[in-house]
Amino acid sequence: MMCGDVMTKDPACCVPTDSVARVAKVMKTQDVGSIPVCERQNSRKLVGIITDRDLALHVVAEGRDANSTNVQDVMTREPFTCHPDEDLQSALNAMQLYQVRRIPIVDRSGQLVGIIAQADMATRGAEREKTAETIEEISKPSTARAA
């Protein structure tokens, strides 16, 4: 099975200068835990990703104002990505290695085409046993990364 078979196509995205308040509202509306960050409006060139964890650790816990804090201040830059034609096992391995729950999917020119989340693999993936192992590994406690 390939990444393109289970990814969510054309996910909502934001730009580095968006406020984290706006992104949090998009997360709520879309019922997602992460938003890919694209270079600029009308561009799908991936430059980062922002997660609900980033919001909790680097905005709320640090007492920052969500309306004046930009995505670029708290996002993960150059996240690990996969391509639609890569085997799903690559995404599973990356999730386990990097302890991430979501992986942006980009074409060969770096344009965002989708995203894979743990839930996508659990509900659509063929390798449910490996997915369960990966979720267990990802869920182990880790230290907070510096912004």
Language-model-detected regions and their locations in the chain:
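The conserved cystathionine-beta-synthase
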Residues: 13-32, 38-39, 82-99, 106
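Tandem CBS (Bateman) regulatory domains
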Residues: 1-10, 51-81, 87-96, 117-147
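A glycine-centered beta-loop-beta connector
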Residues: 27-30, 35-54, 95, 103-119
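A broad "ordered helical/assembly scaffold" signature
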Residues: 10, 22, 26-28, 35, ...
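Short, flexible active-site loop motifs that bind/organize anionic cofactors or intermediates
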Residues: 9-13, 45-46, 81, 111
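A broad, low-specificity signal for short, low-complexity segments enriched in glycine/proline
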Residues: 12-13, 40-45, 63-66
